[in-house]
Amino acid sequence: DSQGKMMPALAKSVDVTDNGIQYNFTIRDDVFWSDGKSITADDLVQFFREILTEENEDDIEALMNVYGARSYLNNEGNFKETVAIWAEGNNLIIRLNSIDDDFLVQLSKPQYRLRKNVLSWEFINNNYTSLVYSGDYYISSMDENQIILHRNEKSNTDIPKVLSIIEDKSEDIALAAFEVGNRDIVVNPPRNQLQRLKEEGKLITLPSNKAVYASFNLDECAIPINGRKKVYSLLDSA
């Protein structure tokens, strides 16, 4: 969230057992793919198999500590019989080689966002309409300067129905549009304006590997509080 606290997304609970090396995620029954189908623990197993197979090791370091992961990548067995990631009913279980206190934090990073057909995302500009992924929004249109997100039918109706992500030519242009009410949120406004925005109660700072600032328009017609909370999580995972 906006305070940097870990919040549940797909799982309603996580139990850590066996001296800290086994994680049991109980998957919620109210989480859905962007096409409206329910997300299951088996879906997550398939996703982890895909990214372990297709992604660079440096990008998925957390999975390199999963029991059997390196053996699988060295062609020493198939995924199901070698890698300690499996489903039991609607529970996803992951067993590590050794304790990793940062494991859950690592899994919250963007590269672990649940999606189908991982390789297809390399060509997102051409096939975004056919991509399937988790989350409250789906991409309805996109071009070089703008992405339009629409709320999924089964998502919470308290969050905004449509989000427009616009790439302005400069920080100053973005802030100017914000000041006249044409932007609800500006990410990384000009540094010389940070103190003023903070004093006006319009600035939040998100924890990250590098500093990320966001300025929120406080107009009553702008994004409501529940919508802001959702945007916090989207920005934090970007």
Segments from the language model and where they lie:
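N-terminal lobe/hinge region of extracytoplasmic solute-binding protein
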Residues: D1-D18, R49, V132
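Aromatic- and charge-enriched surface segment that lines or borders ligand/interaction sites
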Residues: S13-A62
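Surface-exposed binding/hinge segments that line
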Residues: D15, I60-N117
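Gly/Pro-rich hinge or "lid" segments in bacterial periplasmic/extracellular proteins
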Residues: R95-D158, V162
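Ligand-site clamp/hinge motif
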Residues: R151-Q195
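Ligand-binding "clamshell"
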Residues: L194-P207
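Periplasmic-binding protein-like
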Residues: I204-A238
